[in-house]
Regions:
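Cytosolic regulatory regions built on CNB/CRP/Popeye-like sensor folds
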Residues: 1-161
Length: 161
């Protein structure tokens, strides 16, 4: 015989993986569940094979990505310098939300990868539909970019050995 109330006492493990990933990205910090859902509706899920480019250096910059599964390497294709090796939960390309400059580095999947794309057009749609929410995201984005600039300045200020 099956119990009537089993589902009431189970924890919900079926949380949307996109929402779960977004809530851990500093750009979407301090958003309510409803606000996060509005952002998630504007995202685009993409899959990449191992060694497939997410974007190439000098390509038009359209938006940022959050890694759901897999890994991505950010590198300079001219000098072959690796800037970052990223995996699930990491995000990259966020500067493209603000400016229209070409990509300054390339991104390639180091293994099969599933990414969430959030593009400049999505941010503009968010700002138009929900100005307060759009401003929260812009403020968080500014904070993230400021932190990255500060860290870069500290790295450059270190004496070379």
């Amino acid at each position: 015989m099956k119990a009537i109330y089993t589902n009431y006492f189970k924890k919900k493990d079926n949380i949307d993986p996109v929402l779960k990933a977004l809530e851990n990205v500093p750009i979407f910090e301090h958003l309510t569940e409803k606000e996060l859902s509005e952002v998630a509706r504007l995202t685009h899920e993409r899959t990449y094979k191992k060694d497939e480019h997410v974007f190439k250096k000098q390509a038009p910059a359209e938006g940022m990505y959050v890694i759901l599964d897999g890994g991505v390497e950010i590198f300079d294709s001219d000098s072959e310098t690796i800037f970052a090796s990223l995996d699930s939960g990491d995000f990259f390309g966020e500067l493209a939300l603000l400016d229209e400059e070409p990509r300054s580095a390339a991104a390639i999947a180091t293994m099969p990868a599933r990414l969430i794309g959030f593009f400049r057009t999505d941010l503009l749609t968010l700002i138009k539909r929900y100005p307060e929410l759009g401003n929260k995201v812009l403020l968080n984005l500014s904070r993230v970019l400021g932190e990255r600039l500060r860290k870069t300045n500290q790295e450059l200020a270190r004496p070379t050995q």
